[in-house]
């Protein structure tokens, strides 16, 4: 890959991974607009490593506390600190894992068209608009197992390209009365096991290919996606604490219409 391609695609992945705007829509749009070939599986793994590193670094202090509370709760067989939040993230991850195993092949075959991505971008942009009006004051620490499973079921829908994993999980949390910040925080924490699972599956496929890997290209892609993702999360959290989701809704509408025009 050319250096310019690496930087642009890694930036697109890093910026769109955690915003409620659908990274898959952008990764379809940009190469088509610019006439670039598919970036390949190795690059996908690299940028996932970058975005995972970004969110781990952003939450490093909180994650240390959550892990400590989680293992303490197991040892004592009772709730310790914020251990319930860890269980909530775990239970919310189950649906996407099960749905992925059951329907991934069908989704790959039938749902990766430009028109499907365009439709999902618009439909779930509208859902985000209405969910935004339902936001409440609940914090992520009030996430029960039942509510986490509801968010997890919503996340499973994001296996369909164009839905946006972060967008649909924030939408579900907002509909359940969580605040903007809490919805985003839970969505981002939930991204950690999902990125690990998705990246792990891609890595397994990659190990089965005999091709030599362009390590320097992959390192650049991981670094650019990681840095851009980290900065994007920081800016988004600062913005969402005092603003609505409307800018992202409008952006999704425009993007969806543009995708329809391109693929019709």
What are these regions (language model features)?
Residues 1-264:
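Multi-pass membrane proteins that catalyze or facilitate reactions on polyprenyl-/lipid-phosphate substrates
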């Amino acid at each position: 890959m050319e250096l310019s391609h690496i930087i642009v695609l890694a930036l697109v992945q890093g910026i769109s991974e955690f915003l409620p705007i659908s990274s898959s829509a952008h990764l379809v749009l940009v190469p088509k607009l610019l006439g670039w070939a598919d970036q390949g599986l190795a690059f996908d793994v690299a940028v996932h490593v970058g975005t995972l590193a970004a969110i781990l670094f952003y939450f490093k202090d909180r994650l240390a506390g959550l892990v400590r509370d989680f293992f303490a709760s197991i040892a004592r067989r009772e709730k310790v600190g914020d251990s319930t939040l860890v269980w909530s993230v775990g239970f919310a991850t189950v649906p996407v894992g099960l749905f992925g195993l059951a329907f991934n092949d069908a989704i790959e075959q039938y749902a990766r068209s430009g028109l499907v991505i365009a439709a999902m971008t618009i439909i779930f942009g509208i859902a985000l608009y209405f969910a935004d009006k339902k936001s409440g004051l609940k914090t992520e620490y009030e996430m029960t197992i039942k509510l986490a499973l509801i968010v997890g079921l919503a996340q499973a829908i994001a296996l369909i390209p164009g839905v946006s994993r972060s967008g649909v999980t924030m939408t579900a949390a907002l509909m359940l009365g969580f605040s903007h910040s809490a919805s985003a925080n839970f969505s981002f924490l939930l991204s950690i096991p999902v990125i690990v699972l998705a990246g792990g599956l891609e890595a397994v496929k990659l190990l089965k290919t005999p091709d030599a890997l362009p390590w320097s290209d992959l390192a650049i892609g991981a670094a650019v996606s990681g840095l851009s993702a980290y900065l994007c999360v920081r800016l988004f959290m600062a913005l969402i604490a005092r603003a609505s989701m409307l800018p992202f809704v409008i952006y999704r509408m425009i993007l969806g219409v543009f995708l329809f025009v391109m693929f019709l």
